[in-house]
């Protein structure tokens, strides 16, 4: 196996590898290449060049299974995020400095290399605005008005951040119901450390009292659940009448709902009952940052985030 430099900066590498792989006499040899990159092959327009020759594996930052499950460790991962340099920094100030620099590097260097030609100050403002959408349904009209650009341009900016693994657009599930259901995706920063840097949150005390603390923890827990569960499909569900489900997972023929509550003792809510009935869930887990696992109703259970590890 041969290591290859970061493909985001080396845009000709996929074509080069294709030539190497297709050389006469190479067909039955075991040559393998590890192609690293910080963007989806789709956004690099290179997916066809290695079609049938490559397997794409998404590698995320640290998760609770790697850092540990004691309360202090989990809170540090939530605050600083999973990038190794940010998580392992000697203190919160150094971690914040690294994350702030990483954001500027992504805006000024990585995105332009991928064809994102927006001015860096404009893209930075967009990213800062997007931080306030974390955990909310997306509405392109508002940031478009604020930035003085068109809605298609705003959507293109969002798609670039999605394809570079900075943002997750969680798509809505549309059940066969006689109810008006939300059709726009929900926006989550995949790394809460970057989210906190954009929001100016530099320490755990600041995070715990911030107005977006609950939404931040929801996004953090959601990413952990997706890594642990490895579902076949994942969505959220919401109606215009107010019923909603944070996460709907499909795996091995089962339909499982997940709610996230940053509280010491979550309780069953009317929205959970509606989701159980309307979506015909096999189970519903209410994930929270506590220590005890307990039943809330039939097929509904409160589960500590750290208890989800196999």
Locate predicted features.
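Conserved ATPase-coupling elements of RecA-like P-loop NTPase cores
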Residues: 5-17, 45-47
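Active-site-adjacent loop/helix micro-motif of nuclease/hydrolase catalytic cores
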Residues: 12, 264-273
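Conserved catalytic/switch belt of AAA+ P-loop NTPases
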Residues: 14-35
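Interdomain motor-coupling "hinge/lid" segment immediately C-terminal to the ATP-binding subdomain
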Residues: 30-31, 37-141, 166
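Short, polar loop motifs at secondary-structure junctions
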Residues: 38-42, 286-293
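Domain-level recognition of nuclease-like catalytic cores that cleave nucleotide substrates
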Residues: 61, 291-310
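Accessory nucleic acid-recognition modules appended to NTPase machines
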Residues: 92-252
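Active-site ExK catalytic segment of metal-dependent nucleases
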Residues: 255-264
């Amino acid at each position: 196996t041969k290591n290859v430099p970061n493909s985001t900066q080396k845009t000709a590498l996929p074509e080069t590898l294709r030539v190497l792989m297709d050389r006469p006499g190479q067909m039955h040899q075991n040559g393998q290449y590890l192609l690293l990159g910080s963007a989806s092959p789709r956004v690099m327009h290179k997916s066809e060049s290695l079609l049938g020759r490559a397997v794409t594996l998404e590698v995320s930052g640290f998760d609770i299974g790697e850092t540990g499950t004691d309360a202090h460790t989990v809170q540090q991962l939530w605050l600083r995020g999973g990038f190794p340099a940010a998580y392992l920094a000697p203190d919160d100030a150094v971690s914040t400095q690294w994350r702030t620099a990483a954001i500027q590097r992504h805006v000024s260097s990585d995105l332009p290399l991928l064809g994102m030609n927006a001015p860096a100050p404009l893209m930075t403002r967009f990213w800062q605005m997007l931080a306030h959408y974390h955990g909310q349904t997306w509405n392109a009209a508002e940031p478009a008005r604020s930035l003085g650009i068109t809605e298609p341009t705003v959507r293109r900016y969002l798609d670039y951040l999605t394809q570079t693994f900075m943002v997750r657009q969680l798509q809505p599930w549309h059940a066969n119901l006689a109810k008006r259901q939300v059709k726009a995706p929900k926006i989550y920063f995949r790394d809460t450390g970057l989210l906190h840097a954009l929001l100016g949150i530099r320490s755990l005390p600041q995070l715990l009292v911030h107005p977006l603390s609950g939404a931040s923890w929801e996004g953090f827990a959601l990413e952990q659940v997706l890594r642990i569960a490895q579902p076949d499909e994942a969505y959220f569900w919401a109606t215009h009448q107010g019923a909603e489900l944070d996460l709907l997972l499909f795996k091995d023929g089962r339909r499982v709902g997940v709610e996230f509550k940053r509280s010491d003792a979550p309780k069953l809510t009317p929205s959970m009952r509606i989701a159980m009935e309307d979506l015909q869930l096999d189970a519903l887990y209410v994930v929270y940052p506590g220590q005890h696992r307990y039943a809330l109703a039939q097929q509904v259970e409160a589960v500590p985030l750290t208890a989800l590890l196999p």
